[in-house]
A protein has these predicted regions:
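Terminal accessory carbohydrate-recognition/targeting modules of carbohydrate-active enzymes
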Residues: 1-189, 222, 227-230, 241-242, ...
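Extended glycan-interaction surfaces of carbohydrate-active proteins
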Residues: 187-226, 254-255, 260-296, 345-375, ...
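Aromatic-rich carbohydrate-recognition surfaces in CAZymes
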Residues: 225-352, 380, 496-512, 518, ...
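Extended, well-ordered alpha-helical scaffold segments
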Residues: 164, 168-175, 189-196, 243-256, ...
Length: 573
């Protein structure tokens, strides 16, 4: 009853790709200290995984007491010989069936903290069947099978009913099969990676908890356990090819908690929302104060993400063949668009601005090194694009005055954006609190998304993309130009390639009619993910390797790989 047929062998390697299942917060990986041992961890918002180990030093021993090697891992379980190690959506760990005389040894972290796990009084963490405690010292437990088909269950969070291992494996196999059957069709050379990416989107699906009962596809169970607004847009764009309902749900959830002024929160999580500096834990507040502008000292700083909302909604509606989602969400999106112009406007930059690096999605970018308040060409391009989509929706809905408002505002914003164009450098400059920002980053290329810019500007941006001293890296497109003094190959947003910025540039090239160039960048982006070994958070622009601090199984990288691979297949057929 294994899941070997659902995913190509070797993809769940238990190192970069841990074993987990849909709706569970539990992950199982090899112990960093000893590869023959396993660890069970629980993903929680704003808590490092290394601080979330619930079961450590887990191993299966045969009747001689020798360790049974950890074998294959698939979407259903990890296999140690005939013994399965599986987790469930109820955050339980199941191990079995064990032959007579075999045993399981492990260390329960926080063994006296049942109350912290939400267990009712008297409900123990361990449930066993045909097993006897052989040894228990310093938290290490060894359970021996008295007869054939022995098994055990470990509760890791809250109450959970006793379930036999065969029932768990059967249910997990059925759910994994249903999910993988939805994996979109792609070209044969992309299929192996597409299946991994689709599996990642499935297992990253969680019920957030707290006041949020909806299913969210989190960016990663390894460090990003919540619904990030920006991530939700990109994830929905990929999900639309196989699960329209889940795609819609991501956008509806992301837009479900606007402020009274229309601002959309940065993050939704089990403990609440992150919408301003007031919502941050003290450690993050210290970082925020260090990064923020003196202009906003001692103020409540709003935190959000770039306005790509209408684009994501429009693409999901196109996949559905209707306009239902746009009609449902038009007013919320229009209010958030107005918030940028009315509440996130800065006279220092004469336009809407990121009032803090966190709101850009690119908080480590060098454009914020000397200015926290930035009127950025990417933000202005997104606002222009969003107003144009809102104009189209308003005309379709018979809202003529609103359509004209969106049209007029987009034209005014385009005029302001064009003032920052520097033809000799082939890019748009960001504007900070002290004037033009000179750092040469991918943000200066995002106005490719604006239909109607002069052909000379389009060609200037393309020349920058194809300049080997700037953005034509071995693996394109670096987030900072190669010749820029602030370029760093492996540091987040200061050089590495991100799938989402490449995806945006591909859309921009298509908008400008540069179809062959868009296809070439699409192909190289897909090749990068395959060469890099999976949908990582970001990639080296030198060799596509995963930088040391980049997380794995990253949601938008997986989703946008799917989107690009589906488009590639459609072009081929």
């Amino acid at each position: 009853m294994n899941g070997a047929s659902l995913l190509p062998a070797g993809l769940i390697d238990l190192d970069e790709v841990p074993y987990t299942v849909r709706r569970s917060r539990l992950l199982v990986r090899r112990s960093p200290q000893e590869s023959g041992l396993l660890q069970v961890l629980r993903a929680t918002y704003e808590r490092d995984l290394d601080e979330s180990i619930l079961v450590d030093q887990l191993e299966v021993l045969d009747e001689r007491g020798d360790r049974v090697q950890v074998g294959s891992a698939d979407p259903v379980a990890i296999w140690c010989g005939p013994v399965a190690v599986a987790v469930t959506a109820q955050d339980t760990v199941h191990i079995g069936p064990l032959p007579a005389g075999w045993s399981v040894r492990f260390l329960l972290q926080e063994p006296d903290a049942e109350h912290e796990l939400g267990l009712p009084t008297g409900q123990r963490r361990l449930w066993t069947h045909k097993m006897t405690v052989s040894d228990e010292a310093q938290g290490v437990i060894r359970l021996v099978a008295r007869s054939e088909a022995a098994e055990l269950m470990i509760r890791c969070a809250g109450p959970a009913p006793h379930r036999r291992i065969d029932e768990v494996l059967s249910a997990t196999s059925a759910e994994a099969s249903r999910w993988m059957a939805r994996c979109p069709a792609v070209l044969p050379q992309r299929e192996r990676m597409a299946r991994l990416c689709w599996w990642v989107l499935g297992v990253n699906t969680l019920a957030l908890g707290g006041a949020l009962d909806d299913l969210a596809v989190v960016p990663s169970k390894r460090g990003y356990v919540g619904l990030w607004q920006w991530d939700a847009y990109f994830i929905a764009i990929g999900l639309r090819h196989g699960d329209l309902d889940l795609a819609r749900g991501q956008l509806q959830l992301a837009l479900s908690r606007p402020s009274e002024y229309g601002q959309l929160p940065d993050v939704l999580h089990e403990q609440g929302i992150l919408a301003s500096s007031d919502d941050l834990p003290e450690t993050d507040l210290e970082n925020l104060r260090a990064m923020s502008s003196p202009t906003l000292a001692h103020q409540r700083i709003p935190l959000t993400k770039p306005p790509l909302t209408a684009l994501a909604v429009d693409l999901v509606d196109r996949a559905a063949g209707n306009t239902a989602l746009a009609e449902e969400l038009t007013d919320v999106i229009a209010a958030s668009q107005s918030w940028w112009f009315e509440r996130s406007w800065s006279d220092l930059v004469d336009g809407p601005a990121y009032l803090h690096p966190y709101s850009s999605g690119l908080d480590d970018s060098p454009v914020f090194d000397r200015s926290a308040i930035v009127g950025s060409p990417d933000l202005w391009a997104y606002l222009i694009l969003q107003d144009r989509i809102l104009e189209t929706w308003a005309r379709r809905q018979g809202r003529r005055d609103e359509a004209e408002h969106h049209r007029s505002r987009s034209q005014q914003m385009l005029g302001r954006l064009l003032e920052t164009w520097h033809a000799q450098e082939g890019r748009f400059h960001a504007v900070g609190e002290h004037g033009l920002i000179r750092e040469d980053t991918v943000l200066g290329l995002m106005p490719l998304l604006c239909d109607g810019v002069d052909p000379e500007i389009t060609q200037g941006l393309i020349a920058s993309l194809e300049d080997p001293d700037r953005f034509a890296a071995a693996v394109p497109v670096p987030t900072v130009a190669l010749a820029d003094p602030d370029f760093e190959e492996l540091r987040m947003w200061r050089g590495p390639v991100w799938v989402n910025t490449n995806w945006l540039l591909i859309q921009g090239l298509l908008i400008q009619g540069e179809v062959s160039r868009a296809k070439a960048l699409r192909r190289r982006t897909l090749d990068m993910v395959i060469s890099g070994g999976g949908p990582h958070e970001y990639f080296s622009c030198v060799d596509a390797a995963r930088p040391p601090r980049a997380t794995t199984c990253f949601g938008w990288s997986a989703a946008l790989f799917i989107d690009l691979a589906v488009a590639e297949a459609a072009d081929e057929t």
